[in-house]
């Protein structure tokens, strides 16, 4: 393409025409052009330094028109408002926000709104005399949470808020004693989020909070905050890390005193808190929540003392286990949340404990019993202000039906021979002879040995092989082809029953199963059985790290996972775990403390469960396991039962107790049923069903009693009874009359309809014996039974 240039652009071409335009620069040489260019640039630089002031408007004409225009333009601007006085802001800094109307953070009149505080109503005259900056507003729970709270949870949030804000008395602490599965975590998340965001004074009530829990639940708390708040708040979860990292992180949390903290909630375990209490106790904290708070029943331990040193007045204690009638422990719990509410320990003993205990004695006088009753009522009146308790009977409206069964399995011939030989040995005789009022360590070891033998002979094979005292000739009882590391279910009645039931479940359903034991050695046998039958499984015990526990639980609960078995140590994961991926649970051996068993068995029948649940408690017929079950069932006083593994066992067993434990009831279907002296059964056959108002929380005497597989609610157990021929007796009951569709807490429609349908409080009381002095407290119901 040809390009044409203008004449001025063609510098290298001589223009011959005289009439043509010639630029001035073309007539000069190169040096002259450069000088001309520098001259022009210098003039331009000088011109930029000159500031020319605008000339005033001048009118040269003298006409009236020009004068009128000049007068208008010279006049100053005036705001066209009558009597307007301009305010030039001489006393006000630039950028100050104008005062705004004080209002609640959320609409108190919205549908399903949960209002925790309602300000007093003022007349217009009273409002004019009040300072507008001090008018109180409504405190309304975030609709994100109020729309998923069930009626009993709304009541619990309101109760805790009134306690921590001092609305129920001159105290700021409370005990949330709801049973497992009622959503204590969600209620605490709601309370914490509300206090961090608002108050009646239009500002946050607290700036920081600490949640202290067992180490296995720290990650679970973080997940719950994220789940319910949808990531609107970040928590500081202390999981692992070096000492230097932990110290630096906690110091940063402690030094942050701003009202809008980036991570306002610290999630920490009891052990970590105790180690770093010197850092956390330096700063003020808005509120502390203690999960599994029954750990604080001993006021002398270091963890209790460390938490008491925390600078906070708002204390919330969570405990899913019933508060039992050890008055000293009970005082420790109440004194932690509300110091001085019951006075000092000496005052409490003088004012309440001594009088109540004297009234319980069999030889107490009428005056002492009357005084004990008065003191009990006085104590009830005090503690009911700060304790709320509801039973899991409330869950029957939201969860599928739960079938609970106590299965008595016969010992095999091998187990029976070893068991009876040991009871007849000199070892047991010496244990009984050495026992006066306290149990010897030898007797405790013998008790553990018998419990392990009831599970499987493999668990005591080392004693058999070493021919220890009591087992001198027992190794000869084992089969000739016996191999200790190769599981043989036929050597144990409970394992044989478990093997049959797992096979039937695997073949006939897509159900998942949780296996729980108090011994990790039993978990080893579970693993051997799973590998032998080619079942996929996961295992959680005390050796697993906290981070890995969360991954294992998530994998098992995943509906797409093919994991069939979840093996769990009750000591490591009996509290707080949510295993709703399974709907069948085997409690393979009983614990001395019924609360531990209840915690472990509550892992599957929880919020989010959509299938009917089957809970199996296996005990060896006539053995020491039935003795343990009887202690749980009859709920004897704490002087003759073991409450937890932190207490020494020897103070609980007398010589008569040991004689009962070291006895075996042969040729009985169930020693427990015999001792119940059941009037509804004749010759071990039930003639009359339980009352209609009973369920699986009732006493065993009010359950269904089966000496054969007819009438069992579970076809799997019925088939296994016939196939294994090792079941002798079954107690069973259900949670409610009929199964109902499961409803999760995110089902907003059901929550709305339920709240409209029922406006009254839903409270349930414990169905305890008179001699089991369990506190059954709620905001609307007093407990009784000291």
Curated annotation (Swiss-Prot):
Its main location: nucleus. Residues 165-340 form the Helicase ATP-binding domain. The modification Phosphothreonine is found at residue 22. Pfam families: Helicase_C, Rad54_N, SNF2-rel_dom. ATP binds at residues 178-185. Gene3D superfamilies: P-loop containing nucleotide triphosphate hydrolases, SWI2/SNF2 ATPases, N-terminal domain, Tandem AAA-ATPase domain. This is DNA repair and recombination protein RAD54-like. It comes from Drosophila grimshawi (Hawaiian fruit fly).
